[in-house]
């Protein structure tokens, strides 16, 4: 779990519930000892600045070439290809355009029923917390939608990258951590990618 700034402790609790070991990542050398990464929620402008301050941009991009990465809320913003805010320099993992804080400021944070499509032909509605949530405005051809709120995508998967507009760790929705990091799960991303490609 990237621990430069933001909401990382609950991600460790999620991994603990799933029986998956997790460790903090605060410097680029610590990327060498992990097999996947969560970029947590927080303040995307601050996180973008700290990534450059600690010279982690290139190591993170290189890590993402061959390892699964999940971003929640601010983490989704940092994973996007395009963010129309010059204060944020995204990593470009997901071929999406993201609008920061599109669902409101922190005082307007909300819990909404989000419709999820984890497997073809099935959908599940779950109460989901959005805090100053970013909105995905455009999608590239490689993007598969795993969740929608009022017809807009809030959970997207592309290869080994998973981006979420919300905070699954707050609502103990563990399936997203399983998708990227639990090879024994029926929802593991390699199986979902095969389904989406079919």
Could you describe each region identified by the protein language model?
Residues 39, 71, 164:
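Redox-cofactor binding/interface segments in oxidoreductases and associated redox assembly factors
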Residues 2-4, 74, 166:
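Cofactor-binding loop segments of dinucleotide-utilizing enzymes, especially the Rossmann-like FAD-
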Residues 100-198:
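Amide-donor transfer/coupling interface in amidating biosynthetic enzymes
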Residues 43-118:
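Cysteine-nucleophile active-site neighborhood
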Residues 22-23, 69, 161:
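Hydrophobic anchor at the start of a short beta-strand
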Residues 30-34, 64, 139, 156-157:
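Flexible, charged surface loops at secondary-structure boundaries
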Residues 24, 71-72, 156:
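General beta-strand structural signal in soluble alpha/beta enzymes
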Residues 1-62, 174-178, 182-198:
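N-terminal beta1-alpha1 cap of cysteine-dependent amidohydrolase-like domains
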């Amino acid at each position: 779990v990237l621990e430069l700034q933001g909401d990382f402790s609950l991600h460790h609790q999620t991994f603990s519930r799933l029986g998956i070991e997790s460790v903090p990542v605060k410097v680029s050398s610590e990327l060498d000892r992990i097999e996947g990464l969560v970029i947590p929620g927080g303040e995307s402008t601050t996180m973008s600045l700290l990534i450059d301050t600690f010279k982690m941009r290139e190591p993170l991009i290189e890590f993402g070439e061959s390892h699964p990465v999940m971003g929640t809320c601010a983490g989704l913003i940092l994973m996007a290809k395009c963010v129309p805010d010059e204060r944020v320099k995204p990593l470009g993992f997901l071929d999406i355009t993201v609008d920061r804080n599109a669902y409101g400021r922190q005082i307007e944070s909300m819990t909404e029923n989000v419709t999820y499509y984890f497997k073809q032909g099935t959908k599940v509605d779950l109460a989901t917390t959005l805090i100053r949530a970013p909105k995905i405005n455009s999608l590239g051809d490689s993007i598969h939608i795993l969740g929608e709120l009022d017809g807009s995508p809030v959970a997207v998967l592309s290869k080994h990258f998973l981006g979420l507009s919300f905070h699954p760790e707050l609502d103990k929705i563990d399936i997203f951590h399983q998708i990227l990091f639990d090879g024994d799960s029926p929802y593991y991303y390699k199986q979902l990618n095969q389904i989406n490609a079919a």
